[in-house]
Amino acid sequence: MFLIMLKGHILMDAPTPWGIFFQDSASPQMEGIMELHNNIMFYLAIILFTVTWMMITIIRNFVAKKSPIAHKYMNHGTLIELIWTITPAFILILIAFPSFKLLYLMDEVMDPSLVVYAEGHQWYWSYQYPDFTNEDNEFIEFDSYIVPESDLEEGQFRMLEVDNRVIIPELTHTAFVISADVIHSYACPSLGIKADAYPGRLNQASVYINGPGTFFGQCSEICGILHSSMNIAIQSVSIKDFLLWLRDQMEG
């Protein structure tokens, strides 16, 4: 019954009240993060059960009333010491190799088909598409502000919706180049993106979105009084729709 009650709160396309676990994955990076998390939780569950069982057994059986005379082999045991040294080391190796593999895969930026500059300000994001220019030979760029609660339309998310979403094509290697006026952090959970933004320094994050959709994120570094207003909305569309959007931006 408990699992049935939680079913609707475990995997979500967007944040919901009282939601737990991860949002639905929409990129290979996020799928890898979720798989690593689930594997580690499996190891932790086994460790928790084993240690709890051993502690309860020791407390119940090795007390002064039941065993007034200490066992002569309990002061030192080479075998048990080898077991509790080698076993944790082996478990850490099982966790470390997939973790390092995922870390380097996320750090390696493929040759991107699209580059988007994202710059953090107090307290909004501005975006630029350096590969495309409009009729005045200016880069396509815009600012993205939070939509006030009073201006929300039906179906929009409170404290997440923005006035200008980032539009990128699905099934396309995209690189986000990130900078900031003060320290920010560009994070979008469904896509597995989280990159710190520092003044005077460029950081980079890559993403490959599996399908169309809208994915929300927020600044993950406390950056001032309106930190909670630095929302991120990335909309993935088909390549055809992306080209139509680009045409409108170039002409407009």
Curated annotation (Swiss-Prot):
Protein topology in the membrane: Multi-pass membrane protein
Enzyme class: translocase
Reaction catalyzed: 4 Fe(II)-[cytochrome c] + O2 + 8 H(+)(in) = 4 Fe(III)-[cytochrome c] + 2 H2O + 4 H(+)(out)
Mitochondrial matrix side, ranges: 60-81
Record GO biological process: ATP synthesis coupled electron transport
Predominant cellular place of this UniProt entry's protein: mitochondrion
Chain sites annotated for binding Cu cation A1: H184, C219, C223, M230
Listed name of the protein: Cytochrome c oxidase subunit 2
Lineage, top ranks: Eukaryota, Fungi, Dikarya, Ascomycota, Pezizomycotina
